[in-house]
Design a protein with these regions (language model features):
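N-terminal export/targeting signal detector
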Residues: 1-25, 175, 224, 235-240
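N-terminal beta-strand block that forms a small beta-sandwich/beta-barrel module immediately after a flexible targeting
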Residues: 10-54, 58, 220
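Amphipathic alpha-helical coiled-coil/rod segments that serve as protein-protein coupling scaffolds
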Residues: 24-26, 57-135, 155-157
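Surface-exposed patches in structured soluble domains
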Residues: 32, 47-54, 58-64, 114, ...
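Short, solvent-exposed secondary-structure boundary/capping segments
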Residues: 41-43, 196-207
């Protein structure tokens, strides 16, 4: 899932490129932890019967998370199934046209599909971050019901000046620190270096102006224990 970096946010972040100087004299670049988030939406209209998982619960791909009450759809599916069974016998006996047979088969399959939509399942493994609706609420197709995040690997964007960029390359290992946990140290790696500069005049003419160039760098972190969570501030120390 591609993340876009709004220009306004880049400009704001660029003003705070270097958060602080570490004890060893190394600069640390500030970033905010992000994760791949997947929104789950209703595909049918109905009343929420119940949530099958709570916020913060781990979930598996294909796991049912939300049940929508749709007895009317189940009733319609039962009728469509019975009609098709009768149609099969008539078709075999030559008493029903192929057109009518196909129409009843489609109605049966369509009704069964809508019944499956009564249960909202997670398409990915991860953790249920947010539930946006309550039991008993009426929802319609497209309404966002929940968000699941894959926390097994997270990332942060940092912004480095032009002079520093030359020494960086994708795959390079870096150190990161979590201020909220007493400067706990984590290993990370540079996954993407974005080629377009930000926070600088469009027409750079002098060497002094080039020092104002900053580039977005995506740093990824394995997060097996899920210690790093979206929204946390992380400080990245680049190799010399």
């Amino acid at each position: 899932m591609k993340k876009l970096i709004p220009a306004a946010l880049i400009a704001a972040a660029a003003a705070l490129i270097v958060l602080k100087v570490g004890g060893g004299g190394d600069f640390r670049y500030s970033g905010t932890i992000e994760a791949t988030e997947t929104d789950l939406s209703a595909r049918i209209s109905g009343v929420i019967d119940r949530y099958l998982a709570r916020e913060g619960d781990p979930v598996a791909a294909g796991e049912a998370l939300i049940s929508i009450d749709c007895d009317d759809l189940r009733l319609a599916a039962g009728i469509a199934s019975d009609d098709f069974r009768r149609a099969e016998e008539l078709f075999k006996a030559g008493s029903l046209s192929r057109e009518n047979y196909d129409r009843l088969k489609y109605r049966r399959d369509d009704s069964a599909l809508k019944v499956r939509w009564c249960t909202v399942k997670s398409p990915v493994s991860g953790r249920l971050l947010y539930s946006y609706r309550e039991k008993g609420e009426l929802v319609s197709p497209g309404v966002k019901l929940a968000t699941v995040a894959d926390l097994s690997e997270v990332w942060a964007y940092i912004y480095v000046p032009h002079d520093t960029l030359a020494g960086l390359k994708p795959g390079m290992e870096v150190k990161a620190f979590l201020p909220e946990a007493g400067d706990m140290e984590f290993a990370g790696r540079i996954s993407v270096i974005y080629p377009e500069a930000e926070f600088t005049p469009k027409n750079v003419q002098t060497r002094k102006e080039r020092t104002r160039l900053v580039y977005a760098v995506k740093v990824s972190f394995p997060n097996k224990g899920e210690t790093l969570k979206p929204g946390m501030t992380v400080e990245v120390e680049l190799p010399e």
